[in-house]
Amino acid sequence: MKKKIIIANWKLNGNIQLLQTLLKPLVNFYIRHKNKSSIKLVIMPPYVYLYPMKSIISHSSILLGSQNVDINLIGAFTGEVSINMLKDVGVSYVLVGHSERRQYHRENDVIIAKKFKIVKDSHLIPVLCIGETEHEYLSCKTEKICKFQIDAIFDLLGPSGFNNSVIAYEPKWAIGTNTIPSINFIQKILMFIQNYIFNKQNSTIKLFSLQYGGSVNEHNIIELYDVKNIDGFLVGSASLSLDFFKKLLNNC
């Protein structure tokens, strides 16, 4: 059975104390839990906690992820972090294209595609966030928006662009609102994404994983867990709670 990938995006949250009160108990709970074989956990803390987190999770199969990366490898780029630095501290997954990066940091599809490429070139796994605004959702433009965001990767990397990658469908209007699309709608969009990539790569071999993100919590993740085509979840604020992980592991 293919493992579901649960990615915990801590965003601008956390402190040293949280590593002790959340992460250490989570590691112990995960190690001894019977369902750990069906779930792959990836935690993405703020940059400053990557290295201390590495030592805490080192004796478990929990993986380290980064919320961002710069497109440059070295040089006079104050405040940035390169892919080689992330590799150096043990990062396996890198998030690119999150709607908050698109909105607040003016990242466009060209920049996002470059970040995606540099992650792949370094043999790490990129996690591409795609999704529509509420206006686009109400205007029935979800598929069109997802297509544009996917095409930016194919334009730069070609037909094999999404091999060994994760695509997280995360509608912007669902983030932090406690509102999610209907299960039927999520299934429809994930099927569209899958078939669109199959068509572009001229193959129906699924070498990528599809996730849902946006207001995922300890209640709705159980309902969504077995939805067709969902290979995992991108989780925000709920992943700051040990109870979320306990419920997930106890029920999935």
Swiss-Prot record:
One annotated GO biological process: gluconeogenesis
An annotated Gene Ontology molecular function: triose-phosphate isomerase activity
Primary residence: cytoplasm
Keywords (A to Z) from UniProt: Cytoplasm, Gluconeogenesis, Glycolysis, Isomerase
Compartments in which it is found: Cytoplasm
Active site per the UniProt annotation: 98, 170
Name under which the protein is recorded: Triosephosphate isomerase
